[in-house]
Amino acid sequence: MVHATSPLLLLLLLSLALVAPSLSARKCSLTGEWDNDLGSIMTIGAVNDNGEFDGTYITAVADNPGNITLSPLLGIQHKRASQPTFGFTVHWNFSESTSVFVGQCFVDRSGKEVLKTKWLQRLAVDDISDDWIATRVGNNDFTRQHTVEE
């Protein structure tokens, strides 16, 4: 019975050996346009040799939605990894608040790039006694709007 399954097993192992490098070789790139699960849109420019990047963010969620404007972001990523970790800060132009995001850029099994992030948003408050309510915490998943060729 071992001899009958050996060619099948060999074929399976050969297939895995050929497919596995292509899965791990796919590099996730931050550069491009992304949207998240809430409808916010982020554009990240080219990442320089130090891993630094800038871009813009337009949120779909705000306390005063009529005041939303495009806001700048600044960030940095680890360059060596094929699925790098990163962080960036958004300076909201329409409110007295700042957000920081940390996350990792993944390529899922279907080849789709996904940014998994956690964020903190600090709101300005008028009195130190309101400090306890001034920081919000959340998470967002971003998917690429357009494919980027490197």
Curated annotation (Swiss-Prot):
Q: Where does biotin bind?
A: N36, S40, Y57, T59, D63, S95, S99, N140
Q: Does the keyword Glycoprotein apply?
A: yes
Q: Output the PTM entry.
A: Glycosylated.
Q: Biological process GO terms, please?
A: biotin transport
Predominant cellular place of this UniProt entry's protein:
secreted
Where does the signal sequence lie?
1-24
Carbohydrate-modified residues: N67, N93
Where found? Secreted
InterPro entries, from UniProt? Avidin (IPR005469), Avidin-like_CS (IPR017889), Avidin-like_sf (IPR036896), Avidin/str (IPR005468), Avidin/Streptavidin-rel (IPR051764)
> Which GO MF terms are attached to this record?
biotin binding
Membrane-crossing residue ranges in chain numbering: none
Q: Keywords in UniProt for this one?
A: Biotin, Disulfide bond, Glycoprotein, Secreted, Signal
- Disulfide-bonded cysteine pairs: these are C28-C105
- Location of the Avidin-like domain: 26-147
**One Pfam family from the record:** Avidin
Could you confirm whether the keyword Nucleotidyltransferase appears in this record?
Answer: no
> For this UniProt entry, what's an example GO CC term?
extracellular region
Q: Which family does it belong to?
A: Belongs to the avidin/streptavidin family.
Share what the entry says about its subunit structure, partners included: Homotetramer.
Describe its function: Forms a strong non-covalent specific complex with biotin.
Protein name (Swiss-Prot/TrEMBL): Avidin-related protein 2
What species is this protein from?
Gallus gallus
